[in-house]
């Protein structure tokens, strides 16, 4: 077997494990998923699993990174496809993007279970915070700086502001994913989140910060 073919097979085995684990983690959760189920679904040996991943937790972290990256790319793609007639200022766009993330938190079962529900419990607070930082802090801070430059929000230290806004969004997403009635929770938390964010408006003038839609289907706004 050539080196290139061996490398290709190794990559295929790793991807088979990730795909099988993702299905199981999304359907059953981390705690209820056994490694024997994963290797059976992937049609590989247990030795292959431990060749690529130290343990089930490391495999879970890899799956979670994959799901989080896909959601981030989905949000960026949604912004690129945004209706040109909608408000173009950074602050309104950012707040609408937050509502889009809440929609994903409600509709995407992989994101719900793997990232929002099991993620904090399996990784712990420090690793969870690191994930949020990798997948959102830089972009969020850039948008907040744009909103300040456009004088849409009050000038504030961008570092702590980014962390606080990210924490609000993270908790709102977790609340929605874990609710008994996710659809109702998504509407309610969307209203509360946007009302809090509107308070950051220039001079605290809510009249200058009209609410964004929290449900594109029903058109409900606060």
Describe each PLM feature range.
Residues 1-12, 82-83, 204-222:
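N-terminal intrinsically disordered/low-complexity leader segments
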Residues 1-28, 32-44, 57-61, 84:
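Basic, helix-initiating cap at the start of DNA-binding domains
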Residues 50-53, 57:
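A short His-aromatic
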Residues 61-67:
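Alpha-helical DNA-contacting segments of helix-turn-helix folds
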Residues 62, 76-110, 161-165, 220:
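Hydrophobic alpha-helical connector segments
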Residues 69-72, 124-150, 159-163, 187, ...:
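Amphipathic alpha-helical packing segments from all-alpha helical-bundle domains
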Residues 93, 100-102, 141, 155-175, ...:
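Hydrophobic alpha-helical segments that form the core
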Residues 102-141, 174, 178, 182-183:
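Short secondary-structure transition hinges
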């Amino acid at each position: 077997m050539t080196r290139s073919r061996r490398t290709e097979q190794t990559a295929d085995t790793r991807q088979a494990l990730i795909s099988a684990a993702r299905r199981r983690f999304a359907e059953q959760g981390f705690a209820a998923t056994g490694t024997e189920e994963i290797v059976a679904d992937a049609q590989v040996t247990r030795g292959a699993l431990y060749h690529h991943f130290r343990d089930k937790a490391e495999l879970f972290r890899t799956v979670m990174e994959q799901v989080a990256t896909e959601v981030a790319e989905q949000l960026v793609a949604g912004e690129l496809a945004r209706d040109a007639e909608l408000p173009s200022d950074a602050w309104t766009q950012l707040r609408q993007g937050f509502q889009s993330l809440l929609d994903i938190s409600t509709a995407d079962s992989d994101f719900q279970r793997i990232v929002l529900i099991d993620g904090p419990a399996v990784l712990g607070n420090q690793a969870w915070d690191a994930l949020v930082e990798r997948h959102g802090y830089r972009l969020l801070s850039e948008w907040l700086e744009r909103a300040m430059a456009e004088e849409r929000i009050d000038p504030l230290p961008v570092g702590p502001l980014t962390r606080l806004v990210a924490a609000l969004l993270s908790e709102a997403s977790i609340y929605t994913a874990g609710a008994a009635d996710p659809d109702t929770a998504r509407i309610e938390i969307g209203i509360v989140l946007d009302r809090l964010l509107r308070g950051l408006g220039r001079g605290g003038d809510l009249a200058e910060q009209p609410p964004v839609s929290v449900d594109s289907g029903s058109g409900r706004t606060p």
